[in-house]
């Protein structure tokens, strides 16, 4: 069976059960992962980084974790420029530190009206579009890993 393009699929049906909303949201995430997959080479890299991080947390490694980044990431080019610069620093300190770029895609202090970040509104000039925001967020994270080899915290 051929799946319709992502934009043509119907995702949200409003019911009064939280369980249905959770299942629908889960399906959206699975579909986005299928439509925008992480290439096998990046999956391997992510697994290696996750293992290094786990070793620090469990005390198997003497390195320190440093999660570093801006309050909110809402411009893909700027974020990737920042992560590229951080990757250069990472090369200098990788024997003692594991640098994890923070790519936070919400605006944590924005409530009510206003721009809430790329995940809610990928284009600040247009209406909010959560699905497009999830896609933009995934693309930004994949690009950052591809360009730098650094996996991020969100």
Question: Model-derived features: where do they sit?
Answer:
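Glycine-rich anion/phosphate-binding loops
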Residues: 73-93, 127-139
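Conserved, mostly hydrophobic/aromatic
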Residues: 69
